[in-house]
């Protein structure tokens, strides 16, 4: 057989406790009023896959425990630490005080295209993702240290928040 899918036991999966004991990535995810619990769950799953240290759920974001989050997170809401903040700016202020560089993921006049951005080794980044309708709040953009954007070539120039988070977190993955 030329190619074969891996069996579950061949994937090297760890328990949530073992995962939490692994070295951190220096990446925090901030969800700015993301409306869909499915999207929140999918972001947890990507955060787990790419070893984000924490997810901040802000404003109207659904929070665990939630059957809808669990359905798309597949348990990643238990492996990735999370915090709830009533305002996104509260999370930004906390992360800045902890030494994170705040980067919004948004289409902005001064954004840096993702393919031209290289994360600095050892630097801590807080990646802010906006909601499905309005994106990242302008107040949050103005308070950030920078804006990064995923280059797009189609007619929509619009990716689902969970797809965007997966792409960005892969780009910032450790190693």
Label for each model-derived stretch:
Residues 1-175:
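Post-transcriptional modification and biogenesis factors for structured RNAs
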């Amino acid at each position: 057989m030329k190619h074969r899918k891996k069996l579950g036991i061949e994937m090297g999966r760890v328990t949530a406790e073992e995962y939490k004991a692994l070295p951190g990535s220096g990446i925090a995810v901030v969800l700015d009023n993301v409306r869909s619990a499915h999207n929140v769950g999918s972001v947890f799953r990507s955060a787990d896959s790419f070893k984000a240290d924490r997810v901040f759920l802000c404003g109207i974001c659904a929070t665990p425990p939630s059957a809808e989050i669990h359905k798309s997170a597949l348990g990643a809401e238990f492996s990735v630490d999370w915090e709830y903040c009533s305002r996104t700016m509260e999370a930004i202020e906390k992360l800045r005080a902890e030494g994170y560089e705040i980067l919004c993921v948004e289409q902005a006049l001064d954004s840096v295209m993702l393919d031209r951005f290289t994360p600095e080794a050892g630097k801590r980044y807080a990646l802010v993702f906006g909601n499905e309708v309005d994106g990242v709040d302008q107040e949050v953009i103005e308070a950030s240290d920078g804006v990064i954007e995923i280059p797009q070539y189609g007619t929509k120039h619009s990716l689902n928040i969970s797809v965007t988070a997966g792409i960005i977190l892969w780009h910032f993955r450790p190693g």
